[in-house]
């Protein structure tokens, strides 16, 4: 039987909508049950305090969970499943939208794809002349602090898809989104390579921990 603490977030959601729940209540809704001597709301609150945010929580590995009394493999798998479900939702949504509706939508998608990755991943969104999404691909993966990018492969894929424009993105697992000299250099190389085939580079976004940098917003593209 559900306890009162487990019912409260559920009832609030049914009454006022899912957006009305706080981070603690939303987490409690997924955890469903607490641990011996600790109700689910208290457990959710302690977990968020430990990891700092939902981002920190969903990005954590199992070793970081071991210090929490009552949190075993089952709850860890459940939380990682939530993160993967969100990533796939945004991936499907991006494929099914007629066009990129806003920079905010693009950012949300990229954060869902790259947040929490332990290695640098370089992702490219390929667009047609009306900026409809043709495909998004993780073209390159690297180490904790570096990813090798080959501009010709980006152009080759764009030609194959008949793309008119691309959006570049990669993550910084360190959490700091500020671009390095190497990031700026490879962006320039990709732009020059794309220009030969009349393909526009609309932006290069770097995704950090709760922050991002847009080359277009800074006037670098």
Curated annotation (Swiss-Prot):
Identify the domain of life: Bacteria
Which Pfam families has this protein been placed in? RadC, UPF0758_N
Matching entries from CDD domains are given as: MPN_DUF2466
Please give the biological process terms from Gene Ontology that the record holds.
proteolysis
- The residue numbers the entry assigns to motif JAMM motif are 170-183
Residues binding Zn(2+): 170, 172, 183
- In the record, which residues are listed under signal peptide? none
Q: Which UniProt keywords apply?
A: Hydrolase, Metal-binding, Metalloprotease, Protease, Zinc
Single GO term (MF): metallopeptidase activity
Q: Which PROSITE patterns match?
A: MPN (PS50249), UPF0758 (PS01302)
Where does the record place the MPN domain? 99-221
- What family is reported? Belongs to the UPF0758 family. YicR subfamily.
Protein name as it appears in the record: UPF0758 protein YicR
